[in-house]
Amino acid sequence: WDWNINNKTKLTTTVLGKYSMYSSTKLNYNNTDNPAPDYYKSLPSSFYDVWGSNAQYQTPQALAEWQRAYDWLNYSKANRQINWDRLYAANQTVNGEGVDAMYYVQKRHSNNLNVTLASALTKHLTDKSTWNLGFAAIANKGSHYQTMDDLLGANTFHNINTYAIGTYPVGSDFLQYDLNHPNALVKEGDKFGYDYTLNVMKGNIWSNYTETFGILHYSIAAKIGYDGMNRDGKMRNGLFADNSYGKSKTANFLSGGAKFSGSMDLGHGSVISLGLGYEHKAPTANVAFQAPEMNNDFVQNLKNERIFSSELGYQFNNSWLHANLSGYYSRVDNATEWTCFYFDDINSFSYNSLTGLNKEYYGAELGLTFKLTSFLDFKALGTISEAKNISNAKVRYLNSTQGTYVDDIALVENMRESGTPLTAGSLGLSFHQGGWFIDLNGNYYDRIYLSYSPYYRYQTPLKKQKSVDN
């Protein structure tokens, strides 16, 4: 909704509502072997150490096991696929014994309701200056639960934490996923395992001022905001009987920041630009809870991230060359990271939170476009950057087999950000004439790091193994 108050003042108000539903299925197993043909313990490399020097895995018996696994996978393409007939047969066999399904398909659901009210006032103070003032209020409700998608021919399945059976005796309340409905029978379409909602409330007020002053164009902006979040559990987990059902406390955060950006026209096609910013940013809900599938606990030492950012750039334009050169530096303090993964060695899901983590991001970027002819351009792009942790972090982890937390130090200093090239380059030719557009490009990527597992960087076990100094 737009309200033109006068020819220099305008108020724009927006109301937005959005509901989304997302689900994904997964083949799972219960008190039996992993049926995936690419399960690492079924691959040849798990039996014999081909490239290493571990004598324990280089015996004649290990080599024979390697050959057996290799021959099995190469004998038929069917051996490299899931054998659904075998899974159905296994479930039908245990039906007569009154045992729960050995294999089943679960469905994870993440549904999201988001409502936003925002308003912005724009005031043209002069022909060369503008002031903006606005606010936004956001409410978000995320529903997260798991249902039984397909029992694969089985008759029964109970809402029991089978991962913890080795830790607690059969029949123990600690094994119940929902003490409000103990030993509940799960049919296709029923919820099991976990069911909770995350409620997030946000509000912020912001303002910015822009002005063109001769050869200088600049903008100053600031904002202050509130973030609140809580968890509402729908199941009373046996490992956290008093801290999993119902609403948690609400975590409250005051956030805010300011930034400056400006550019100066030096003439003859040259422009220099500068940007600076500092912000206190509230943690997001997806990293704020220690084990949201199990309890209401927030991550310990949860704080605002402190973010400093800066950028300096130079741009040159003339009839035959367009060039951009820029450098940037950013630092993040008090970062929080959260991961959950299945730890096969102990048959458990592990919930890990890293807090007090400091990071740096810096680099340089160059882009050039040469006009070789009226219809042919040569383009060159390149970047070299760094994105890494500059400190160790506090770690707290919880395994789904037991309801106890472990605190330690994660030795993650100098670990890089994963999944993105820190060095990249591109060369290309662009042809455009007579309605035809043809591009030929060559790209180069380097320093793409794999993600690391915090589990293998806990200080206490590494000290016991004498794998670290001090």
Where would I find each of the regions flagged by the language model?
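Transmembrane beta-barrel strands of outer-membrane/channel proteins
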Residues: 15-19, 133-139, 220-226, 260, ...
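Signature of Gram-negative outer-membrane beta-barrel scaffolds
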Residues: 104, 130-267, 287-293, 394
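Outer-membrane beta-barrel transmembrane strand signature
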Residues: 60-111, 187, 194, 407
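Extracellular loop and loop/strand-boundary signature of outer-membrane beta-barrel proteins
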Residues: 102-107, 120, 155, 189-195, ...
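Surface-exposed extracellular loop regions of Gram-negative outer-membrane beta-barrel proteins
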Residues: 175-185, 228-239, 250, 264-310, ...
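A surface-exposed, glycine/aromatic-enriched loop/edge motif typical of exported proteins
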Residues: 20-89, 143-175
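Outer-membrane beta-barrel transmembrane strands
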Residues: 1-28, 100-144, 188-217, 250-255, ...
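Gram-negative outer-membrane beta-barrel transporters
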Residues: 215, 329-331, 352-456
